[in-house]
């Protein structure tokens, strides 16, 4: 089966693994997936990132974070915003604040993939890939 939207596939794998309280999850490797994973790690949603394999067989292993005795997932929701059929672009002023600043929007800009906070600091806009909170 071909995967037409690897970003949605990545978000779904992370969401499913965190709901089942898995400690790690594996996603197919790509530059975009790795960039998104680095933003998630920087923002404190995942614990670690490991790359395995080369070329088309590469995989990224993400360590998921939980809090409290009941292992409540740090990622409560992940929503894909810009889709292959309908791309969503925002300028600096139009960048959304997710949950009043408690969540993060992941933006693909001309300077790479970054969080909405970093994009605002640099004064650039871009494609809104997803919301994470």
Curated annotation (Swiss-Prot):
Disulfide bonds: none annotated. Keywords: Ribonucleoprotein, Ribosomal protein, RNA-binding, rRNA-binding. One of its GO terms (molecular function) is rRNA binding. One of its GO terms (cellular component) is ribosome. InterPro entries: Ribosomal_uS8, Ribosomal_uS8_CS, Ribosomal_uS8_sf. It comes from the Bacteria. One of its GO terms (biological process) is translation. Gene3D superfamilies: 3.30.1370.30, 3.30.1490.10. Belongs to the universal ribosomal protein uS8 family. PANTHER family: 40S RIBOSOMAL PROTEIN S15A (PTHR11758). Part of the 30S ribosomal subunit. Contacts proteins S5 and S12. One of the primary rRNA binding proteins, it binds directly to 16S rRNA central domain where it helps coordinate assembly of the platform of the 30S subunit. This is Small ribosomal subunit protein uS8. The lineage of its organism: Bacteria, Bacillati, Cyanobacteriota, Cyanophyceae, Synechococcales.
């Amino acid at each position: 089966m071909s995967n037409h939207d690897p970003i949605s596939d990545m978000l779904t794998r992370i969401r499913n693994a965190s709901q089942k309280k898995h400690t790690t999850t594996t996603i197919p490797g790509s530059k975009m997936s790795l960039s998104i994973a680095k933003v998630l790690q920087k923002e404190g949603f995942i614990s670690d990132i490991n790359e395995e394999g080369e070329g088309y067989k590469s995989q990224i292993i993400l360590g998921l974070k939980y809090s409290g005795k009941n292992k409540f997932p740090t990622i409560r929701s992940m929503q894909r915003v810009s889709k292959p059929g309908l791309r969503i672009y925002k300028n600096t002023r139009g960048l959304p604040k997710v949950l009043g600043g408690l969540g993060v929007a992941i933006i693909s800009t001309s300077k790479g993939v970054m969080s909405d906070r970093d994009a605002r600091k640099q004064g650039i806009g871009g494609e809104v890939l997803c919301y994470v909170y």
